[in-house]
């Protein structure tokens, strides 16, 4: 587990470790895969296109269920986050590759990305003053509690994903040491399920936080506005 923090090479004074390399590798794979998958879309899709469309439609349905009026705005960010974390969690299945999400620095970066994105969506959709005003409701005395809540949920996002993925890798290593060749297949299935579940939880929490940032505007919409 310590290998995730070891430096592979240096760029000037900056040490580049396995977490950074794996993270950039996953981003390249996702970008290249998205480009290749969208080059030759057909009305009569093959198995690969059907699978991709199924993934996209599933994520889209989840987003529409939480923020139906703002699905077009929120979907690209949440879908990208879901796919990245899912692939990152599964990357440890590759021999000698450690999942970036088993490194606290990576999960902290993801949590900070969510933190700033939530506020960005809130300000973009509501406007700066209306968005900031909701921190003073129902009483200005609750402002410190709102601020503490924002900080603690960001920390919880980072620590939850890191702790679960680190414990998953540690448990897998211990089982392999004890059970040897009898463990790989059940362990592989457990790893896949847990990796996807953790990605789902992180993405769903992000979606709920974004919905919370824009809900005051949605609540002010009249029935007539909803029809239009």
Swiss-Prot record:
List all membrane-crossing ranges: 16-36, 74-94, 103-123, 139-159, 173-193, 194-214
Q: Does the keyword Nucleus apply?
A: no
Localized where? Cell inner membrane
Its predominant location is membrane
Q: Which UniProt keywords apply?
A: ATP synthesis, Cell inner membrane, Cell membrane, CF(0), Hydrogen ion transport, Ion transport, Membrane, Transmembrane, Transmembrane helix, Transport
Record InterPro entries = ATP_syn_F0_a_bact/chloroplast, ATP_synth_F0_asu, ATP_synth_F0_asu_AS, F0_ATP_A_sf
Topology in the membrane?
Multi-pass membrane protein
Q: Which family does it belong to?
A: Belongs to the ATPase A chain family.
Give the function comment from the record: Key component of the proton channel; it plays a direct role in the translocation of protons across the membrane.
The protein here is known as ATP synthase subunit a 2
Q: Which organism is it from?
A: Pelobacter propionicus (strain DSM 2379 / NBRC 103807 / OttBd1)
């Amino acid at each position: 587990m310590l290998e995730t923090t070891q430096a592979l090479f240096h760029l000037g004074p900056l040490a580049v470790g396995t977490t950074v390399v794996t993270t950039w590798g996953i981003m390249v794979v996702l970008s290249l895969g998205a480009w290749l998958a969208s080059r030759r879309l057909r009305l009569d899709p093959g198995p690969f296109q059907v699978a991709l469309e199924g993934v996209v439609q599933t994520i889209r349905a989840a987003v529409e269920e939480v923020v139906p009026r703002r699905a077009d705005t929120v979907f690209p960010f949440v879908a990208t986050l879901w796919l990245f974390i899912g692939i990152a969690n599964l990357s440890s299945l590759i021999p000698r590759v450690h999942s970036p999400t088993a490194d606290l620095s990576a999960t902290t970066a993801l949590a900070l990305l969510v933190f700033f994105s939530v506020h960005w969506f809130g300000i973009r959709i509501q406007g700066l003053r209306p968005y900031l005003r909701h921190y003073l409701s129902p009483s200005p005395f609750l402002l410190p509690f709102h601020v503490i809540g924002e900080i603690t949920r960001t920390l919880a996002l980072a620590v939850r994903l890191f702790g679960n993925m680190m414990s998953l890798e540690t448990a897998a290593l211990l089982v392999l040491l004890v059970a040897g060749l009898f463990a790989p297949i059940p362990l592989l299935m457990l790893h896949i399920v847990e990796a996807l579940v953790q990605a789902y939880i992180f993405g769903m929490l992000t979606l709920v936080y974004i919905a919370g940032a824009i809900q005051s505007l949605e609540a002010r919409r009249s029935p007539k506005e909803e029809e239009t």
